Amino acid sequence: MEENNQNQCIPYNCLSNPEEVLLDGERISTGNSSIDISLSLVQFLVSNFVPGGGFLVGLIDFVWGIVGPSQWDAFLVQIEQLINERIAEFARNAAIANLEGLGNNFNIYVEAFKEWEEDPNNPATRTRVIDRFRILDGLLERDIPSFRISGFEVPLLSVYAQAANLHLAILRDSVIFGERWGLTTINVNENYNRLIRHIDEYADHCANTYNRGLNNLPKSTYQDWITYNRLRRDLTLTVLDIAAFFPNYDNRRYPIQPVGQLTREVYTDPLINFNPQLQSVAQLPTFNVMESSAIRNPHLFDILNNLTIFTDWFSVGRNFYWGGHRVISSLIGGGNITSPIYGREANQEPPRSFTFNGPVFRTLSNPTLRLLQQPWPAPPFNLRGVEGVEFSTPTNSFTYRGRGTVDSLTELPPEDNSVPPREGYSHRLCHATFVQRSGTPFLTTGVVFSWTHRSATLTNTIDPERINQIPLVKGFRVWGGTSVITGPGFTGGDILRRNTFGDFVSLQVNINSPITQRYRLRFRYASSRDARVIVLTGAASTGVGGQVSVNMPLQKTMEIGENLTSRTFRYTDFSNPFSFRANPDIIGISEQPLFGAGSISSGELYIDKIEIILADATFEAESDLERAQKAVNALFTSSNQIGLKTDVTDYHIDQVSNLVDCLSDEFCLDEKRELSEKVKHAKRLSDERNLLQDPNFRGINRQPDRGWRGSTDITIQGGDDVFKENYVTLPGTVDECYPTYLYQKIDESKLKAYTRYELRGYIEDSQDLEIYLIRYNAKHEIVNVPGTGSLWPLSAQSPIGKCGEPNRCAPHLEWNPDLDCSCRDGEKCAHHSHHFTLDIDVGCTDLNEDLGLWVIFKIKTQDNHARLGNLEFLEEKPLLGEALARVKRAEKKWRDKREKLQLETNIVYKEAKESVDALFVNSQYDRLQVNTNIAMIHAADKRVHRIREAYLPELSVIPGVNAAIFEELEGRIFTAYSLYDARNVIKNGDFNNGLLCWNVKGHVDVEEQNNHRSVLVIPEWEAEVSQEVRVCPGRGYILRVTAYKEGYGEGCVTIHEIEDNTDELKFSNCVEEEVYPNNTVTCNNYTGTQEEYEGTYTSRNQGYDEAYGNNPSVPADYASVYEEKSYTDGRRENPCESNRGYGDYTPLPAGYVTKDLEYFPETDKVWIEIGETEGTFIVDSVELLLMEE
């Protein structure tokens, strides 16, 4: 068969890289005008961000002075044609008209501004520039929303970015020059607040709309990917790149020129010859293949050094094409990185290796489609490949096989068209990827070039005249736990994320000044956890080691799982000055727990960039003075320092005082004295509004009815590196019922009716610190604050002054007013916040009732603790509306409950007093009634404990409304126990001290039951327990035993003397009558027999039935878990209150029986013996009571 080597080459079609496209049948010429304008604007923002007339003229020259209605229309068409969606005519016309109007008014404003610059003291020029600013500002506030009309946000996005940039520029003017124009300080500050708010608002809209536009596109075929990538690229150039510079308009953060960099990558169209109108996408890679093969994963910023291309060929017609390649790049400060082979390492020709000694700013490529005739009957073979590329650098060109016609400058035009492209280029080549697909009968291969903006410098050089912004992706090493992730859209590139504490990244910097110079730095970051960042300089080339130069807190800015937005990103303050160790130097950055090793590490830290500025003595003094002035002025409600702001805490004032104290006497002595007087005035105002007595902890328990009351283990300590004044330490406690506590009552006379009050303070560290505010009910919070450990850098011990005091001017972790915790209306206080607040509402006040308000701090476990100070209790605001109605309702409910409590108390007190009085012979309460037994005392005690509100349930040392009557009766109960114990001659008869005082034969146990009672257990018949007891011959005694018999046999308690006179009590687990020797009686007729003793002794279980809830009809089935019917004061909020006195006596379970007998000894010694015949005998108590004469 004869081979036909003829083939047809189809040239690259314009529709693969269109300069004009068809939309709805209409031919619209677009070119790249919107991209040209945007690139020129970005170049201007990179190099000329200094405010003033020059900046405004630049905006006119690059945008607003050259763009008319047709150009604005081209901005809209640029996106419309990609998303195949037209803006509604009304919206289009309104947007173009508004843009034209804004441009006209901006030109007038610039004229007025330039006139004022030339004659700044002329009232006429000042008035005119204010008028023109206000007109333009109002138009922008009105018109910018028209550039985000619902449904058309994506095609309007590029003009939205231009208008937003203009608005931020003039707002910055008003903040910088406003007071010189004649605006008030209040007006300037209001404009600054709007500037900050709009920076976030505009940046977030740009990023969110960008993502929404991409998400709305189809994602199936190769052509879908082409559209997707073009939209991604064009919106990056015309929107996101501009939005990345929005934060630089914050002139208070950037008082001098910042040096911004764009590290993001954009991708030009694949070098694949394809005509979507004539050819099928079946021979091309799918959307997913393109996205996974052509687009690189997020990575550190790298620089292209070498490209080696491997040439392949197709046998039919011997057609050579780009078959694969390898890229060698480098990281700034790091070594070379060799990529894996893209495509195939073919060897049909020797590999072409190109080492570029400069940036590749342009490629001219030749992608081809060859229709190759194969031997019959095979169909023609479609071969798509790249047959040649020319790479251009500013000084040279490098050619692979041949030069093509597909020019990268048509997609990424120069940023400056006034000079040749080798000087005015906007992007440089940074990488190349490869895509392919094969089948029958076709083979498709293509190269995709990625590009980075030229603003991303090839070194991290510190310019001493500017604020140097260095994206952290320009480091050379990230450590385990750190990853590079796709940026949120408004950062100008990818960012770093770390999900655990540890080393973050290492980067190399070059210093363009003497090595002895000192610098400051700060971070732009977002974090869902509190952390501390440590910067080491002089690290090894691996990024390990070095000396700590910066140690500063990064406070939480977002919640876990929250999306990254411009609002979630914050800046730290500039650090204390530090020096580099070498030139170039290695910076190591790590993240550590903010509060020490025990801190919770859940959450993530994201860092966008580090910013470095030169610092000198004058700069430091001016910076410190500016910061101190700002902090002092922020304390007051107005410039005349009449009143403090409500949110200014006492701790805050102390920290501001430290700032003032640390100002340089050499550079700003007069200013320091003035600020010191102001901050002292602020401290006095703070003391005046604080309703707490002795807020500085001069003493505890100094006065019975005033100031702080607390447990004896609390310590007061002097100021340290955290507190300027005294603070208290609350240690743990070994018994929950005896907590460590600190409390104070706010007198009723200090409170205003229907007002909200706030308790707040500063906690250095705490574990389960309980905080209460109590009036009608309790507001309660449990606060955990891991300790800071130390505020000083890790490289040095806490410095001290010449007299041993903390040196608060030494470099340390700086105070951050944003570290706050607010607990309002029952909300849970966030953990790990040093500042706490707790609110409570007060209804009507009554000086006669003197209810007042209790402030309580409590620690109730051994391992817990707290250190706190700067406590304040102050009036917050009058109650209105719903809050007023709520407190009135709470007050009414409280009064209703108080009335019910009073009625209940009258009844309960009467019953309790009668029970207590019945124990004694007379009203002197010095002798017990003859028939008073332990059960009767328990029963009386039970009734006393039914008196509610004897003590506050939150802290039982604070008396409640019924404290006086409770303590009166409880004291008599205590007396009854003492008299009863004096009358019982058996020692340790309740076995609470084990077998102390008892003689033991055989195996016996003392067990603590579930009701916390100790019982004697005799499990074997040969065992015996006995005790010798001294008695008075001729006197009568009562032997009383409470016991339980388990199983067969009998349990016996015998009393006898040496020779005779023996008596015993027997216990069995049966219902048959038992015959007792001598004067004993059966279980069933014992009560009747007792009547013979003229009522002196009543039922054997008198008192016990009530105190223990005993029921003789319950079967004697021994239960290991007692069926408690415990008694308390009926409130149950405080389980420890019943421990006061003997109120914790617990009842016996069912099955226990109490028996007694009379005994008249003839000698001075008797023996009590306990034993059993079979089974198990359990004895609760043995008593031998002397009868009254």
UniProtKB/Swiss-Prot annotation:
GO MF annotations, alphabetized: signaling receptor binding; toxin activity
Xref: InterPro entries: Cry1Ac-like_dom-VII (IPR048645), Cry_V (IPR041587), Galactose-bd-like_sf (IPR008979), Pest_crys (IPR038979), Pest_crys_Cry1Aa_dom-IV (IPR054544), Pest_crys_dom-III (IPR005638), Pest_crys_dom_I (IPR005639), Pest_crys_N_sf (IPR036716)
CDD domains in the cross-refs: delta_endotoxin_C (cd04085)
Biological processes annotated in GO: sporulation resulting in formation of a cellular spore; symbiont-mediated killing of host cell
Coiled coil: none
Gene3D superfamilies, sorted: Galactose-binding domain-like, Pesticidal crystal protein, central domain, Pesticidal crystal protein, N-terminal domain
Protein name as it appears in the record: Pesticidal crystal protein Cry1Ca
Superkingdom of the organism of origin: Bacteria
Family, as annotated: Belongs to the delta endotoxin family.
Gene name in the database record: cry1Ca
Record's keyword annotation contains Transmembrane: no
